[in-house]
Amino acid sequence: EVHKAGANSYQELVNYFKPQFLLGMSATPERTDDFDIYKMFDYNIAYEIRLQQAMEYDLLCPFHYYGITDITIDDQPINDMSDFNLLVDEKRVDYVINKINDYGYSGDRVHGLIFVSRKEEACKFSEMFNQRGFHTCALTGEASEKQRQEAMDSLESNKEGSLDYIFTVDIFNEGIDIPKVNQVVMLRPTQ
């Protein structure tokens, strides 16, 4: 996986080894950081398939994408740089819940991931969702592999009291496989 191949630490690792053949795979070879992944592999492309083609071949699960305008509180738009109190304002939490209920999910119950920008935001959102009858947890990069696995297992479970949502910061962005996830909510900027 060469998604982060432009990072110095990654370059050091790749330059340390001297393989006869180096294979790199990425779902996102065009990068916003201006790093040329193609150049790293001498512009050799063994196979390429684009998102639309992969969906046509049923290699990916179908999805619906909805862009939703965030709420304005006290005439201030909410964004990643907003005051923390605005990010977790009661009105915003209720607004988010109304929107996720409006757009729904596929299946008997929700198995959702909600991405936020800050650890404190994940913890507070989880607490406020739980107060409103949901079963959620907050996971960040500080969570152990055991904690992550237990949360994923609970999210996948259909048992009473299992997780409805995991609020996450800086993990589950890539290379994650939780087949039952049927709703993803981005409450942070995306590229």
Predicted regions and their residues:
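Residues immediately C-terminal
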Residues: 1-4, 12, 174, 186
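Post-DEXD/H (motif II) to motif III coupling segment of the RecA-like Helicase ATP-binding lobe
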Residues: 3-65
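Short glycine-/polar-rich loops that comprise or flank the Walker A/P-loop
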Residues: 18-21, 44, 60-63, 132-135, ...
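A short beta-strand-to-loop transition that corresponds to the Sensor-1 phosphate-sensing loop
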Residues: 25-29, 118, 169-171
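Switch/connector loops and helix/strand junctions flanking conserved nucleotide-binding motifs
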Residues: 31-35, 74-76, 176-177
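Conserved interdomain linker/interface between the two RecA-like ATPase lobes of SF2 helicase motors
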Residues: 44-116
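Conserved helicase ATPase core of P-loop NTP-dependent helicases/translocases
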Residues: 113, 121-173
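A short beta-strand element within the Helicase C-terminal
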Residues: 164-189
